[in-house]
Amino acid sequence: MKRIALFLLTNVAVVVVLGIVASLLGVNRYLTANGLNLGALLGFAFIMGFGGAIISLLMSKPIAKMSMGVQIINAPRNADEAWIVETVRRFSEKAGIQMPEVGIYEGEPNAFATGAFKNSALVAVSTGLLQGMTREEVEAVIGHEVAHVANGDMVTMALIQGVMNTFVVFLSRVIGYAVDSFLRRNDENSSGPGIGYMITTIVLDIVLGFLAAIIVAWFSRQREFRADAGAAQLMGRKQPMINALHRLGGMRPGAMPQSLQAMGITGNIGKLFSSHPPIEERVAALQNSQSA
């Protein structure tokens, strides 16, 4: 709950800073002269930016269960399920968090963690992961996901996404008004936003959205390095995580929804937009780390 409160306070602080900077630069007077209220725009940017991020965060568990077909292990039906639950329990105690829900789903090798609160999260592994790895390697992957939960990565990434969303919404509309005002500077009968505003806003929403995605992906990759190190600490040595990464490098990872990729063990391709670093970089980081 503390992280959610911090999330909201940080978001409000960002909006306040945007308002102060806009006022100091004279943007407030310019927007008012052209029929746009700065406070209303900031409120709109806050709702669109942070509202979407917080809703996505709060809905992450039910969406994950539904979209991935996750079966929650309430009562283990076999030795594998009992081992998974016990492994998550052991790592959770060691990481100082409450026991997450544990699930399993049909699919290619992958795993993920999700949830708005680190003491009521979900850790799920695929059947492909269980079939394609040794138990020690699966244990390392589970440690990686528990580390994501313990580090509060779900809230952190939602916060970063919310900040980026707000900047995109705010900047695209301020620039849109500036372009529209310039294009209609000699039209004394014009009122309200025109076609210049609408086109500029749409284009900038797309362009700035891509730039924001690159920034969010960069932060996600840094969290992956930290989760790898966390798995090594939970296991007491780093070689199992290194072995698991090598194994994943030779597998075809299972697809996951975009909202879950950042908390999985492998992510989408494309260096700039990838939520995960290349396998070789993760292995090198572990080998050079001071983890066990």
UniProtKB/Swiss-Prot annotation:
Cellular location(s): Cell inner membrane
Question: Which parts of the chain span the membrane according to its record?
Answer: 4-24, 38-58, 152-172, 199-219
Query: What are the EC numbers?
Result: 3.4.24.-
Q: Which cofactor does it need?
A: Zn(2+)
Q: Which residue positions are annotated as catalytic?
A: 145
Pfam families (alphabetical) = Peptidase_M48
Q: Which Gene Ontology biological process is one annotated for this entry? A: proteolysis
Q: Which Gene3D superfamilies match?
A: Metalloproteases ('zincins'), catalytic domain
Membrane disposition = Multi-pass membrane protein
Binding residues for Zn(2+): 144, 148, 224
Specify the protein name.
Protease HtpX homolog
Starting at the broadest rank, the lineage of the source organism is: Bacteria, Pseudomonadati, Pseudomonadota, Betaproteobacteria, Burkholderiales
Q: From the UniProt record, report the name of the gene that encodes this protein.
A: htpX
